[in-house]
A protein has these predicted regions:
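ATP-dependent carboxylate/acyl-activation modules
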Residues: 1-178
């Protein structure tokens, strides 16, 4: 096992995360600060639906999936099982496509996604993305809430054995409102 150390990280502070960054785009610029949000499973705003099948291992996997998925390109679904990344579908135009791609990556790499945990970096705009993951046997699925169809996604989630955890989009989505 090899471990790389980045000595520049030793001088970082929380002030660094609050530093404003500017980036030019055609016709203007983007203004953005760092994203200091860290998922806390004890957060009172965390909504747990159908959490009966969720294990401590699933919740540990969720923390890893969050760390990977929240720092990946937008429109990501990340799969973790037994503390190991098994699928990371990034930059997809549709959440359901990201779900299918993450499962395909896991399968083509020789991993069984049954019992795994999924992190979605935003809400499911339709139930189909959740259903794809639940039908693959995932034990825990996390997504933000904030879609106009959240109720339909919750109804779909209630039909499956997978746990479904959500936090408001404005709380846990680093690029909320982009």
């Amino acid at each position: 096992c090899r471990m790389w150390i980045n000595s520049a990280l030793a001088t970082l502070s929380l002030d660094y995360l609050e530093r404003v960054q500017y980036r030019s785009v055609c016709g203007g610029f983007l203004r953005q600060t760092g994203e200091p949000f860290i998922l806390n499973l004890k957060d009172e705003r965390l909504n747990r639906l159908a959490a009966g099948m969720v294990t401590e291992a699933n919740e540990r996997d969720l923390l890893l999936a969050f760390a990977i998925g929240s720092t990946s390109v937008s429109n990501t679904i990340t799969l973790v099982r037994y503390g190991m990344l098994i699928g990371n579908a990034v930059g997809q135009h549709a959440r359901v496509r990201a779900a299918k791609l993450a499962l395909m990556i896991a399968s083509e790499s020789g991993h069984d996604p049954a019992g795994a945990t999924a992190y979605s970096d935003s809400f499911f705009p339709e139930p189909d993305g959740f259903e794809v993951l639940a039908n693959a046997g995932l034990s825990l699925i996390f997504a933000s809430s904030g879609s106009i169809k959240d109720a339909l996604v919750r109804e779909a989630a209630a039909k499956y054995r997978a746990g479904f955890y959500t936090l408001p989009d404005a709380v846990c989505r680093g690029f909320f409102g982009h």
